[in-house]
Every structure is written in structure tokens, then in C-alpha cells.
């Protein structure tokens, strides 16, 4: 879990911004860790000669072994990408891949990093016209909220994944207790040069900086994107986060405040249990305006929720303050009542609406905050009706059996 403080640092560092295409809110919090090793980037309107409209860039970097690589990436990766020839040609997939590798090499060649053991994840989103390009290396995560459904734009890179494990072993490493060489809990990162061999190609390293890139064409169903480090995803599923954010939007809360509330609901009340909720936390929420202004975008989502168009966390989640919240008047920590419900589930990928009916058997219990929301009922109503009809028949038969047993018991008593 790493070293922790006796009391968490719950001060938030929040920013926001907008243009005609996106609105974003971003917040970070040190939490229980002895230092803050996360970093982020939010650049509106990057210039690209290949497209008419400006390009928007968002990224979250989760550092480990120190903060130097993460902070360097937060300051330099956007510029490396913008200067990349492939970026200026409009080849955004290859531009993202080569920019991650170029950043890795630039750090390696920098004298100030020669004795630095740190590394960082990177999850990046580019908005280019009506497309999203998501590049990811590590176990930070980017998720799209599409009418309340979590759609993964990235996949966590864990050493236990068979493809990742095969690369690690082929490069001379091993996986022990779910960690690279028994040490690192993720299998791709920028930095971490103790795991890199100058005789191997960048994509074949034990720990590679090469990202996976997902391209998504934005549809009218798509509402917002959430980028966050694993300090969030270890505590909430992708589906829970999307529903939490959606409820905050319905309540008219600013995106940076929703991010703050989410972190407060993830942070642990103490460090005595599993270690979940004790990490640094960073959350970036990006609204996809799609020709709406801010107020129209908020109203569109509120109208959808009012019409029961997709799952949303219950109304009380817009006001819930978790263990990390402090009063704005005196910075006094609020004592959380014993019956406060703080979800502590291991993160899981979201599921898109094209999934088959067996993709998630009971999302309302394991991955959803929406009261009464059932995956099958929402997307496979005919199947749900058949199951409900069968269940009702079972209940009727069960009630009949109970009644018969009662009659027999009365007769026996007489």
C-alpha cells in the first residue's frame, strides 16, 4: 500500500475550462499518502494543421516511486505530441504512440533522471472533431458515459493479463504475486528504467511505455468522459463512477465539484483495513457539448434522467459527503455516521450497450448505484419480462404451497 500519514491531506486542487466543444472540471487530492505523485494536463485548442477545428487534450498521470516522471509528463507530453509530425499530418493514433515512446526516451536521456527510480501511468484523451482518441499505458483509466452506461475507452495494463505476462517473460522478467518481478503492480509505464533494457525494442520491454489507442466516434448518446487514476478505480467500478457523475450533473453541480465529491466518497476513513481509498486521487471530467452550450448540456442530461433514459445514482448521492469532506467554514473534518454507505468494490470495466445479455448478470448489485436498475431489464426487456413472468409463477406456486401447508397444520391441530 505504501507509507501513509496519520491524517489524510484532503485539500483539493481544482481547475476548470471550456471552449465551444468541451467543458471540463479537474481535481486532485493527496489523501493518506506521504506525498502527492499524481499529475495531469488539460490543454484546450491545440493547433493541428491537418484539421480545421482545434484539438483538445486531457491526461492523468499516476506516479510511483516518486513524482518526477509524472510531473515531467504533465508539463511536457502535450508539447511533445503537438510537435509530432504525425500529429500535424492528422495521424493521431501513431502520433500518440510515438509521443509516449518519445517522452520515455527524453526522460532516459535527461541527466536529472539518471538516478531517479520513478515512473508513471498515462491515460490521455484527444478530442478531434467528432472523434475521441484515447491512449493508455498503465492502470489509470478512461471511461465514456453514454446515457448513463460506462463504456471503457482504455484497458488496465496489469501483469496478470496473459498478453502482458507473455511480453514480460519474453523480455526476461517474471510475474510474482501479480507484480512485475514481484515489485511493480502495473505492466506499462513511462519511466521505470530499472525494468527497461537498451538492447530491446521499446514495445518489447518488461515494462513498456507503448500505449494502447482506442478511437471512438462520438454519438448523441455520449455525454461525458472521466479520466482518473487507480485511486478512484480501486474504490468504485466504472459504472458507479458514471452514475455518480451523472447525478451530480442532474443536480447542477460544477464538474470540478463533482470530481471533488467523488474523491471524498472514495477516500478511506482510516488506514486500518484493506488499503483501498488510501492512494493519491485525480479525476478529470470532460463534457461533450455537441453544439450545446453549458446550460443546454446540463438540461439535456437532466431531461434524460427524468425520462428514465439510462441509469443514474440516487438523488442523495448529489449531497453525500464521504470521509474526505471538510466544512468550508472552518476546515473541520466531518464525522461520518456509522451507517454511511461507502462503496468499496474492486474496479471493473464498464459494459457497452452492444454487449450480450450475459455480460453482466446483476449490474445493480455489483456495478451500479441506480436504485432498482437491472442490466437485462434496461437493454433486454423481452428477456427480463420472461424471467419476471417465470419468477411470478414461482412466487404464486410457493404461496400456494405455503397455504396448503397452513391448512394441513390447522387440521392437525384440530
Curated annotation (Swiss-Prot):
Basic and acidic residues composition bias: residue spans: 350-363, 401-414
InterPro entries: PP2C, PP2C_BS, PPM-type-like_dom_sf, PPM-type_phosphatase-like_dom
Stretches for region Disordered: 313-368, 380-414
Cofactor: binding comment: Binds 2 magnesium or manganese ions per subunit.
Taxonomic path: Eukaryota, Fungi, Dikarya, Ascomycota, Taphrinomycotina
Residue stretches making up the PPM-type phosphatase domain: 23-288
EC number(s) per entry: 3.1.3.16
Compartment(s): Cytoplasm; Nucleus
Residue ranges, compositional bias (Polar residues): 390-400
Keywords, in A-Z order: Cytoplasm, Hydrolase, Magnesium, Manganese, Metal-binding, Nucleus, Protein phosphatase
Protein family membership: Belongs to the PP2C family.
Binding site for Mn(2+) 1: 62-63
Entry keyword annotation includes Transcription: no
GO annotations of cellular component type: cytosol; nucleus
Assembly description: Monomer.
Organism, as annotated: Schizosaccharomyces pombe (strain 972 / ATCC 24843)
Example of a GO biological process term: cellular response to osmotic stress
Protein name listed in UniProt: Protein phosphatase 2C homolog 3
Gene from which the chain derives: ptc3
Known role: Dephosphorylating regulator for many key proteins. Has an important role in osmotic stability and cell shape control. It may negatively regulate the osmosensing signal transmitted through wis1 map kinase.
Binding residues for Mn(2+) 2: 62, 230, 279
Amino acid at each position: 500500500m505504501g507509507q501513509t500519514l496519520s491524517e489524510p491531506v484532503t485539500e483539493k486542487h481544482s481547475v476548470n475550462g471550456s471552449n465551444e466543444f468541451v467543458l471540463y472540471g479537474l481535481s486532485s487530492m493527496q489523501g493518506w499518502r506521504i506525498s502527492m505523485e499524481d499529475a495531469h494536463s488539460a490543454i484546450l485548442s491545440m493547433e493541428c494543421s491537418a484539421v480545421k477545428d482545434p484539438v483538445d487534450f486531457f491526461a492523468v498521470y499516476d506516479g510511483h516511486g516518486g513524482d518526477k516522471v509524472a510531473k515531467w509528463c504533465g508539463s511536457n507530453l502535450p508539447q511533445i505530441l503537438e510537435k509530432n509530425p504525425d500529429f500535424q499530418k492528422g495521424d493521431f493514433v501513431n502520433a500518440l504512440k510515438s509521443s509516449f515512446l518519445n517522452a520515455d526516451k527524453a526522460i532516459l536521456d535527461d541527466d536529472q533522471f539518471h538516478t531517479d527510480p520513478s515512473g508513471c501511468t498515462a491515460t490521455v484523451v484527444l478530442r478531434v472533431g467528432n472523434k475521441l482518441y484515447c491512449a493508455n499505458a498503465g492502470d489509470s483509466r478512461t471511461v465514456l458515459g453514454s446515457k448513463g452506461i460506462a463504456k471503457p475507452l482504455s484497458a488496465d495494463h496489469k501483469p496478470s493479463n496473459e498478453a502482458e505476462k507473455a511480453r514480460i517473460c519474453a523480455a526476461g522478467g517474471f510475474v510474482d504475486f501479480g507484480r512485475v518481478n514481484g515489485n511493480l503492480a502495473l505492466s506499462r509505464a513511462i519511466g521505470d528504467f530499472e525494468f527497461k533494457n537498451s538492447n530491446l525494442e521499446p514495445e518489447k520491454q518488461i515494462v513498456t511505455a507503448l500505449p494502447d489507442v482506442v478511437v471512438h466516434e462520438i454519438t448523441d448518446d455520449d455525454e461525458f468522459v472521466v479520466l482518473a487514476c487507480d485511486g478512484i478505480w480501486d474504490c468504485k467500478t466504472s459504472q458507479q463512477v458514471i452514475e455518480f457523475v451523472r447525478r451530480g450533473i442532474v443536480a447542477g453541480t460544477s464538474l470540478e465539484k463533482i470530481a471533488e465529491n467523488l474523491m471524498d466518497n472514495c477516500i478511506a476513513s482510516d488506514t486500518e483495513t484493506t488499503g483501498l481509498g488510501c492512494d493519491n486521487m485525480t479525476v478529470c471530467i470532460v463534457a461533450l457539448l455537441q453544439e450545446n452550450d453549458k446550460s443546454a448540456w446540463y438540461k439535456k442530461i437532466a431531461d434524460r434522467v427524468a425520462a428514465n433514459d439510462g441509469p443514474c445514482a440516487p438523488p442523495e448521492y448529489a449531497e453525500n459527503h464521504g470521509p474526505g469532506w471538510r466544512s468550508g467554514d472552518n476546515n473541520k473534518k466531518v464525522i461520518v455516521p456509522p451507517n454511511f454507505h461507502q462503496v468499496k468494490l474492486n474496479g471493473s470495466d464498464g459494459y457497452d450497450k452492444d454487449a450480450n445479455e450475459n455480460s453482466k448478470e446483476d449490474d445493480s448489485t455489483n456495478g451500479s448505484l441506480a436504485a432498482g436498475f437491472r442490466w437485462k431489464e434496461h437493454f433486454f426487456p423481452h428477456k427480463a419480462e420472461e424471467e419476471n413472468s417465470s419468477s411470478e409463477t414461482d412466487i404464486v406456486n410457493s404461496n400456494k404451497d405455503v397455504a396448503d401447508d397452513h391448512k394441513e397444520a390447522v387440521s392437525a391441530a384440530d
